[in-house]
């Protein structure tokens, strides 16, 4: 299973480089079309007010990628990464993408992940490759 990922500070890129999975980086500069199943790994950059939480503009590349030529139709699941110190907006972008496209949020980890996180994502990818089914539950 291929990983499609977005990285702002390099944390997500470092995590992906620790896996043995094929991958492609989402960048703001190109239109990337996916024609095979993939897992999306996205960091979260969000803002929160008393009435609303939303991803900030730096995350537009993730939403643009998912919409481009209906890439979201090939996405088998979403993995969020972030910092738990941000409490209510921890992995918010992953939750927002999951809710928008009704794609399961399958896993989350902090920063650039631990060896256990790498093993868990590789196992999850292998299970999906072997036909495992997952169910969408709205994370918001």
From Swiss-Prot:
Pfam families reported in the protein's UniProt record: Flavodoxin_NdrI (PF07972)
Gene Ontology terms, MF aspect: FMN binding
Biological process according to GO: protein modification process
Transmembrane segment boundaries: none
Family listed: Belongs to the NrdI family.
PANTHER family hit by this protein: PROTEIN NRDI
Function: Probably involved in ribonucleotide reductase function.
Protein name (record): Protein NrdI
Annotated organism of origin: Lactococcus lactis subsp. cremoris (strain MG1363)
The organism's taxonomic lineage, starting at the top: Bacteria, Bacillati, Bacillota, Bacilli, Lactobacillales
